[in-house]
């Protein structure tokens, strides 16, 4: 089998498995199996692959045909121009979440302390620290396995993050100028209807936001006050249909300057608000 034939075979197998971008995935898996790049492929596309390369490529194709996410097979995902290690213990970083990072960067100044709640792979806090100077970063997650991934990503990207295993704010003692969070926000009954890559293979504890999808917003808005400085800012990623509900919850809890920010696709994606210490209401 030549490299060219391998691409065609892979594309056919993945199309039958209803993979949306079958050709691109076939190429990426071939590149991984054979340890080649585009330049090598175009020069050698009609050369025969070794039996070992064929076996490895077929094994990778089988995994993808089972709808295992490509990023879990390859073991990494790009986010904010940086590379992050990923596995089934963490959500795969998505471009939508870059909107949260970009909005946070607009309000973070040198000398500030930033907390990433529900950090997962660590992509949010690590991207913030890579794009700021003299900023202290901390991150929490309830999952020990997720924190292990996040710690590796911090090391690979050359930043220091104070990681803490915590059920939301349970073990958070410090005060922060900015708190960012991409919490679980999918309604429980929606998860089985998501594409298999998400519903079967991504960690449900990082997806499930309870019956209405809003459980973690309520808890974070209520509990963040002990750790968010007066006039500090809280920023959430939200589902595209949750902007009104989350912003109203923040306003009712006494946050000011609450507004919804859209992502590049024009969908509501981030809610941001300022902690007004004069107003203390329970959500």
Q: Which sequence ranges carry the predicted segments?
A:
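Short alpha-helix
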Residues: 238-253
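Glycine-rich S-adenosyl-L-methionine
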Residues: 142-144, 196-229, 233, 239-242
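Non-catalytic accessory regions of SAM-dependent methyltransferases
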Residues: 1-36, 42
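Active-site beta-alpha loop architecture of Rossmann-like, nucleotide-cofactor-dependent enzymes
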Residues: 71, 186-189, 241
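Conserved SAM/SAH cofactor-binding pocket of Class I
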Residues: 95-193, 197, 219
């Amino acid at each position: 089998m030549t490299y060219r034939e391998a691409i065609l075979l892979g594309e056919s197998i993945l199309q039958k498995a209803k993979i949306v971008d079958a050709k691109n995935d076939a190429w990426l898996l071939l590149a991984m199996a054979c340890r080649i790049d585009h330049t090598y492929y175009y020069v050698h596309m009609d050369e025969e692959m070794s039996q070992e390369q064929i076996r490895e490529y077929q094994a990778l194709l089988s995994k993808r045909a089972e709808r295992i996410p490509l990023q879990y097979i390859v073991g990494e995902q790009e986010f904010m121009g940086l590379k992050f290690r990923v596995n089934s213990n963490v959500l795969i970083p998505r471009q939508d979440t870059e909107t949260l990072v970009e909005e946070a960067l607009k309000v973070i100044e040198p000398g500030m302390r930033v907390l990433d709640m529900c950090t997962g792979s660590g992509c949010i806090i690590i991207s913030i620290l890579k794009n700021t100077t003299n900023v202290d970063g901390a991150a929490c997650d309830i999952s020990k396995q997720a924190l292990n991934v996040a710690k590796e990503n911090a090391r690979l990207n050359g930043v220091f993050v104070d990681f803490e295993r915590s059920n939301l704010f349970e073990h958070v003692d410090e005060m922060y100028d900015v708190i960012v969070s991409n919490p679980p926000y999918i309604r429980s009954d929606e998860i089985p209807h998501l594409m298999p890559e998400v519903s079967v293979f991504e960690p449900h504890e990082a997806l499930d936001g309870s019956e209405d999808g809003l459980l973690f917003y309520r808890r974070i808005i209520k509990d963040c006050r002990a750790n968010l400085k007066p006039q500090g800012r809280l920023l959430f990623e939200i589902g595209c249909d949750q902007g009104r509900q989350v912003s109203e919850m923040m306003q009712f809890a006494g946050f000011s300057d609450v507004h919804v920010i859209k992502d590049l696709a024009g969908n509501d994606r981030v809610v941001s608000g300022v902690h007004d210490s004069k107003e203390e209401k329970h959500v």
